[in-house]
Amino acid sequence: MSKKPAALIILDGFGLRNETVGNAVAQAKKPNFDRYWNQYPHQTLTASGEAVGLPEGQMGNSEVGHLNIGAGRIVYQSLTRVNVAIREGEFERNQTFLDAIKNAKDNDKALHLFGLLSDGGVHSHINHLFALLKLAKSEGLTKVYIHGFLDGRDVGPQTAKTYIQQLNEQVEEIGVGEIASISGRYYSMDRDKRWDRVEKAYRAMAYGEGPSYRSAMDVVDDSYANGIHDEFVIPSVITKENGEPVAKIHDGDSVIFYNFRPDRAIQISNTFTNKDFRDFDRGENHPKNLYFVCLTHFSESVDGYVAFKPVNLDNTVGEVLAQHGLKQLRIAETEKYPHVTFFMSGGREEEFPGEERILINSPKVATYDLKPEMSAYEVKDALVKEIAADKHDAIILNFANPDMVGHSGMVEPTIKAIEAVDECLGEVVDAIIAKGGHAIITADHGNADILITETGEPHTAHTTNPVPVIVTKEGVTLREGGILGDLAPTLLDLLGVEKPKEMTGTSLIQK
């Protein structure tokens, strides 16, 4: 029997704006997208800020986008969750923080605060550090030391001094805290098992080993003089007048790691917490029995306490499809495969009953501007075959190109990327329509829509622009003011499935 599949097609990084300069989305020839846009009901969706559980004005990203899409509701991201906790006074009542402070106070130990020193909002936010300093002060701590990781990636490449200045002012105002070490995130936040980098950061923090300076500003000045920008600043130790380190991390000290995004926090955390750590020799006197607090849950491998525990997402789109006995397919190339599986399922690794997954390998190239089509054609070929085989009721697909090539900040390759995706989109959607099915064509956030900054530099980051949504169903209208959290209810609506109460998003199809 022929299936009439409903598909959710995510054009990753495909934002909309009117200005065409530096806008690969507008400049690309995309006859298929344009045809669907003109022929079928369409609207725009908000994919950034509080609409996706981020702070207002914060650009969205693929993880956040797919989490919201799959959950069918606004999923408050760690950054917003912590901001709200600070705003509403929950932060200073957080028992995990208070226990870490008590450990330091009762045992005459130090409290070490470490994390990324910027307001980039991707891995951390400097305001969370300031809130911790205020809390330490209000609880009467005096031995409070900061190990700052310089960013230069989620913010400008030479912005460290701005953040160090802000920190110095806050320390002065609050009356507690001293910078003990500084390192570029390249070392302290590696996630690719380059342990030689991590070891340099670890030794600066634990042993006070590395280049030494009288102030954090001196570290940055010297680095810049040697052509080294924030991200790559060599782990350095701040010393007192007598040349001794301001602080080292000692046995039994308390540590609060205020990064909220896990991936780049795991390795350095394991280095401090794992009894069986073997990736490099930590030395005989490495600090033991630390009261180690992670802001959020980093990994099972990290032996520490968690201040903001994970929120379980029940009844995501995949779970609801499974409950109704519907067969679903998730398909993407490597770069976005975790997004259509793990993130779309609310942070769940395993498949739901009736769920099939197809992973197409991303091409092995140094950077994707060298192969803007990536593996879009292979993804399309595999999917068209699946549609013909009548196996699936629901399909969730991601085309990675506009985002991955857009990160190059290069207009021509990104135009090529979008044109390749458009060609593939046409074949996929036409195959679905030929089966009597429907497609929702949308995006998770912007990127390819701004590739040149106002000063003419390459723009490599995501954008806060709205994203398109097209539903290939004649005779219906879509409501305005939609968000990514409305997409799962819309998909369920197309399949005639009632959305669960946990999904606070609503179908975009007006009744």
Swiss-Prot record:
Top-level taxon in the UniProt lineage: Bacteria
Q: What is its EC number?
A: 5.4.2.12
State any GO BP term from the record: glycolytic process
Where on the chain is Phosphotyrosine found, per UniProt?
Answer: Y36
Active site residues per record: S62 (phosphoserine intermediate)
Report the family membership.
Answer: Belongs to the BPG-independent phosphoglycerate mutase family.
Q: What is this protein called?
A: 2,3-bisphosphoglycerate-independent phosphoglycerate mutase
